[in-house]
């Protein structure tokens, strides 16, 4: 998967189109990412189940995963770009911006 944890991404499709955020977690098996402040849902939590920082029960607002095809990585110039790969001089695989050719 070309989007990793810590990447800055732009949402290109869906209700949160145009929103920018940092990737909190990536789930390669399901091809989904968790983006900070994007795709927020309300979850009803029981009183006895402390989950994701909620000591008492009630309604908790949290991020839900979004499909990786609905986001684009933001490069060093601040523009959304597609991601490519190349091998550096040591033979290590690095991600490259398709827009400007710089390393991500």
Curated annotation (Swiss-Prot):
<feature type="region of interest" description="Disordered">
    <location>
        <begin position="82"/>
        <end position="104"/>
    </location>
</feature>
<keyword id="KW-0687">Ribonucleoprotein</keyword>
<dbReference type="GO" id="GO:0005840">
    <property type="term" value="C:ribosome"/>
</dbReference>
<dbReference type="GO" id="GO:1990904">
    <property type="term" value="C:ribonucleoprotein complex"/>
</dbReference>
<dbReference type="InterPro" id="IPR041988">
    <property type="entry name" value="Ribosomal_uL24_KOW"/>
</dbReference>
<dbReference type="GO" id="GO:0019843">
    <property type="term" value="F:rRNA binding"/>
</dbReference>
<keyword id="KW-0689">Ribosomal protein</keyword>
<comment type="function">
    <text>One of two assembly initiator proteins, it binds directly to the 5'-end of the 23S rRNA, where it nucleates assembly of the 50S subunit.</text>
</comment>
<keyword id="KW-0699">rRNA-binding</keyword>
<comment type="function">
    <text>One of the proteins that surrounds the polypeptide exit tunnel on the outside of the subunit.</text>
</comment>
<protein>
    <recommendedName>
        <fullName>Large ribosomal subunit protein uL24</fullName>
    </recommendedName>
</protein>
<feature type="compositionally biased region" description="Basic residues">
    <location>
        <begin position="93"/>
        <end position="104"/>
    </location>
</feature>
<dbReference type="InterPro" id="IPR005824">
    <property type="entry name" value="KOW"/>
</dbReference>
<dbReference type="Pfam" id="PF00467">
    <property type="entry name" value="KOW"/>
</dbReference>
<dbReference type="GO" id="GO:0006412">
    <property type="term" value="P:translation"/>
</dbReference>
<dbReference type="GO" id="GO:0003735">
    <property type="term" value="F:structural constituent of ribosome"/>
</dbReference>
<dbReference type="InterPro" id="IPR014722">
    <property type="entry name" value="Rib_uL2_dom2"/>
</dbReference>
<comment type="subunit">
    <text>Part of the 50S ribosomal subunit.</text>
</comment>
<dbReference type="Pfam" id="PF17136">
    <property type="entry name" value="ribosomal_L24"/>
</dbReference>
<keyword id="KW-0694">RNA-binding</keyword>
<comment type="similarity">
    <text>Belongs to the universal ribosomal protein uL24 family.</text>
</comment>
<dbReference type="InterPro" id="IPR005825">
    <property type="entry name" value="Ribosomal_uL24_CS"/>
</dbReference>
<dbReference type="InterPro" id="IPR003256">
    <property type="entry name" value="Ribosomal_uL24"/>
</dbReference>
<dbReference type="InterPro" id="IPR008991">
    <property type="entry name" value="Translation_prot_SH3-like_sf"/>
</dbReference>
